[in-house]
Swiss-Prot record:
Belongs to the UPF0335 family. Disulfide bonds: none annotated. Transmembrane segments: none annotated. One of its GO terms (molecular function) is DNA binding. It comes from the Bacteria. This is UPF0335 protein Nham_1221. Pfam families: GapR_DNA-bd (PF10073).
Length: 89
């Protein structure tokens, strides 16, 4: 008798299982898309390198373009201050 009750799931339990499964599948799909995008980005950098561009400089520019102007200016000021302190400027 206990197995008959266990075999029949409550609707709320079934809903929770279905919802959990859907969430996991979405995460897996997004992880796969993220991997594909990462591969595509790596290919673009490889193409740029093949065309003679400095990949390290490109990565720096991409990172800097993500920052707002004030944040970027502050970071550049700090870098310049450190470089002056080290006699590099």
């Amino acid at each position: 008798m206990a197995t008959a009750v266990a075999a029949k799931e409550e609707p709320a339990t079934r809903f929770a299982k279905d919802q959990l499964k859907a969430i996991i599948e979405r995460i897996e799909r997004l992880e796969e898309e993220k991997k594909t995008l990462s591969d595509d980005i790596r290919d673009v950098y490889a193409e740029a390198k093949g065309n003679g561009y400095d990949v390290k400089a490109l990565r720096t520019i991409v990172r800097m373009r993500k920052q707002d102007a004030n944040e970027r200016a502050e970071q550049e000021t700090i870098l310049e201050t450190y470089m002056q302190a080290l006699g590099m400027l």
